[in-house]
């Protein structure tokens, strides 16, 4: 009897220790190693007086950490292919005829292909913003440069070690669009930290076009598998969903968008 009780105590102790084990998630990429990602996006946009439109997009991109100093990494992202079609499904006017728009034929899309986009990340996977010289060299519109460089994007990883089932929060703000995102470590495998996230996105974006303000109310959620050794996303296992409503006072009300992402 005493042996049985002792065995149970040991088992409970082991389970408690496992439940309390904490993990330090960090971005520690191998320098000059190129990772290839294929992202598929399915989007539905419902525009008042026009009707819903659907868009399927495939993005091929390479990512590479090229330099490191004081826990900061210079990461190059190169879009090698962007292909997709936007198709109106119902509505009135020209869109009702069902003409499809091929994204790869659009000049702004062509301008992105095979031109490295440089970002700085710290070891929490927090983007510090693009390097201004690089955005200028790419010919990015000045208003877009300002938006990219003023963006406050969330860190993917917490500052402290966390246990499975533990939450942490991060904030994001881009040109008036603010959100607080709750992350949760839901599983640890031999290869990956599995993290889910969910958050609201609300605000008024004022610099899309001169004199135009866009009110946005939405939600973002998803699941990401991060490599335990490098902190990179593990290709082929990640998903996200974004839903939002948008309105331009005096111009358009009730526009809705839903986006599903697989990477």
What are these regions (language model features)?
Residues 103-118:
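A glycine-biased structural micro-motif
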Residues 20-97, 166, 170-263:
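Acidic, serine/threonine-rich low-complexity disordered tracts
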Residues 10-18:
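Hydrophobic h-region of N-terminal signal peptides that target proteins for export
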Residues 128, 134-186:
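Extracytoplasmic beta-rich ectodomain segments of secreted or membrane-anchored proteins
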Residues 1-4:
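Positively charged n-region of N-terminal signal peptides that target proteins for export
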Residues 101, 133-142, 203-208:
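Short, positively charged
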Residues 121, 161, 226-227:
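Hydrophobic alpha-helical segments, especially N-terminal targeting/anchoring helices
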Residues 69, 120-122, 130-134:
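Short beta-rich binding modules
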């Amino acid at each position: 009897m005493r042996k049985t009780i002792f065995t149970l105590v040991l088992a409970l102790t082991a389970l408690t220790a496992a439940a309390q084990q904490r993990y330090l998630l960090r971005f520690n990429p191998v320098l000059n190693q190129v990772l290839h990602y294929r992202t598929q996006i399915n989007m539905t946009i419902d525009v008042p007086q026009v009707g819903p439109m659907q868009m399927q997009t495939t993005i091929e991109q390479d990512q590479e950490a090229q330099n490191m100093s004081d826990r900061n990494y210079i990461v190059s992202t190169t879009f090698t292919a962007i292909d997709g079609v936007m198709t109106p499904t119902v509505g009135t006017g020209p869109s009702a005829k069902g003409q499809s728009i091929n994204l790869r034929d659009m000049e702004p899309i062509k301008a992105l292909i095979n031109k490295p986009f440089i970002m700085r990340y710290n070891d929490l996977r927090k983007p510090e913003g693009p390097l201004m010289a690089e955005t200028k060299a790419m010919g990015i519109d000045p208003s877009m440069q300002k938006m990219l460089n003023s963006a406050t994007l969330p860190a993917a990883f917490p500052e402290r070690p966390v246990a499975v089932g533990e939450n942490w929060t991060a904030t994001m703000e881009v040109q008036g669009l603010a959100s607080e995102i709750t992350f949760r470590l839901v599983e640890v495998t031999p290869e990956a930290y599995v993290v889910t996230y969910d958050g609201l996105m609300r605000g008024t974006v004022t610099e899309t076009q001169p004199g135009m303000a866009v009110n946005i109310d939405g939600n973002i959620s998803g699941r990401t598998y991060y490599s335990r050794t490098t902190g990179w996303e593990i290709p082929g296992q990640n998903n996200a969903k974004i839903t939002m409503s948008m309105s331009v006072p005096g111009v358009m009300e009730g526009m809705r968008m839903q986006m599903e992402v697989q990477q």
